[in-house]
Amino acid sequence: MILIGNQEFYKGVGKIQYEGKNSDNPLAFKYYNPDKIVAGKTMKEHFRFAVAYWHTFCGQGGDPFGPGTQQFPWDQASDPVQRAKDKADAAFEFITKMGFDFFCFHDIDLVDEAPSLAETEKRLEQITEYVAHKQKASGVKLLWGTANCFSNPIYMNGASTNPDFNVVARAGAQI
């Protein structure tokens, strides 16, 4: 089942199917056939693919030579929680069109970090409820979720190993 949110982000793209190595369809699996039995298990059982939020929906193409230039349609709303909901809609549409069963994320991949930890927690509560609904509707499961205790400059000297105990305490609260 393909899960589409308030808008379709990947218009014209249906569920990605296995078509074999001779297919010229760029949106088809050439070698991965989820139903093929290999060593007593289906390929789907052997290859438990997970879509990583950070790499798939958050990266904007930045590198040491300059900022990112990729702009995504789910990253347009001015309200950070709405932007996070749009990203979740795009994510679950993508995951279900790919036919994958799992996703993974860092906390601030789901929703932008706020100026304060308390406000970040409020945002996380809102998006967590929304994502849980998406999981239930799609059957997509969480492979892992964790705290990003490295991107914020406050963690420049580490999180749990930071010499400033205020930073250690913040990391503990974030986790």
Model-flagged regions — what are they?
Residues 1-174:
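N-terminal pre-domain/capping segments
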